């Protein structure tokens, strides 16, 4: 799996700036429940072809009386679940008592730690890092996060020190699970019924292996079989004993969710019907869309709602999830089992759509019909031309469209084409990505050369104009 890198340090040393440089995002996932994450940011970055997950732990306190008292418990949890730690210090202020306490705490963790000296722009790097050798965390690495200097070299250095073996657990899982098994990640906010749903699915089917260690620290991979087809459920909340299925709060980790989506073929996103779609739900949906995984929506706790309440919930879903019209919605009760059995069929259809072969002749026919029904707009008096299309990838399906001036194609027209391809090909349950490529004009910048006959005709016309 992707390595998890935690950014640790005192307040105002530049952790958030470095986070934004590494991920080019400010996305924060907030859990509205006491004791859960409130101030951490999560993002995904990539160096070359190697992705990684970054956690910004926020300020860890400036109290020299003791690190344990100054640290937030959630920041400690982030350090605990990280595979590597970037310890940021301020190169302008030099090491402080709090830095020394933090360094001592990190040394006890037994994890790879890189000492990163930020704010070294405009100063001699050797002088800026000299005092930090006393922290006992190896060679300090100077950067200037605000200007992006030294960050590429830093990440090359960090990832070189992390073995590719982070993917070995996933590979081992593929050996253990049944051949061709569909991996389903059950994700959602705390207390929406994820574990109840997992246990309901397992209670209805024959469990081949009940408890298999997963690739994430608390997620569990559970193979099962239904109608002769193998599946693997990924429970991001961790497997519970049956006596504890009714816990009031499920364990919640963004890291688990991101890793589960990476390992899965299809994601079942569980939403609490009684609370509707929250901001945290939309953040999770954003992560699913970014991952490109096929998606099924499970609207849980449907039982007990009156007819009016159900209509209100459906109206809210239509209003807030207009961008998610490709995902099938299933109204279920994980506690009582109503509607749960239909989820497997929805998963199969979504995965089939995500993996489908899209013949080029059919794509070109659909493109031609779409352009004939609604032509692209004019740009500076010239019509944007879409020439041909072909498949560029699967899971999610990628359709590559070639033409001229495609960079100027409006977003509304791109969405129109996406809807046309989805409807015509029945690609529901999976995101569809369109890529537009402009063909180079070999005659650009060249003037047509006139033939001798054309030159004589031009001279005659010029003489007539002069008269």
Swiss-Prot record:
Checking SUPFAM superfamilies in the record gives: P-loop containing nucleoside triphosphate hydrolases
InterPro entries given in the database record: G_ENGA (IPR031166), GTP-bd (IPR006073), GTPase_Der (IPR016484), KH_dom-like (IPR032859), KH_dom-like_a/b (IPR015946), P-loop_NTPase (IPR027417), Small_GTP-bd (IPR005225)
Q: What is this protein called?
A: GTPase Der
Its assembly, as annotated, is: Associates with the 50S ribosomal subunit.
Query: Which family does the record claim for this protein?
Result: Belongs to the TRAFAC class TrmE-Era-EngA-EngB-Septin-like GTPase superfamily. EngA (Der) GTPase family.
- Binding sites annotated in the UniProt record for GTP 1: 9-16, 56-60, 118-121
User: Is Nucleotide-binding there in the keyword field?
Assistant: yes
Residues where GTP 2 binds = 188-195, 235-239, 300-303
Q: Residue span of the signal peptide, if any?
A: none
Keyword Ribosomal protein assigned: no
Which keywords does this Swiss-Prot/TrEMBL entry list?
GTP-binding, Nucleotide-binding, Repeat, Ribosome biogenesis
Function noted in UniProt: GTPase that plays an essential role in the late steps of ribosome biogenesis.
What does the record give under GO molecular function? GTP binding; ribosome binding
UniProt region (Disordered), positions on chain: 439-467
* KH-like domain: residues covered: 356-440
Residues in EngA-type G domain copies: 3-166, 182-355
Q: Which organism is it from?
A: Alkalilimnicola ehrlichii (strain ATCC BAA-1101 / DSM 17681 / MLHE-1)
Where is this chain compositionally biased, Basic residues type?
448-467
The protein's matches in Pfam families, at most eight in alphabetical order, are given as: KH_dom-like, MMR_HSR1
Biological process terms from the Gene Ontology for this record are:
ribosome biogenesis
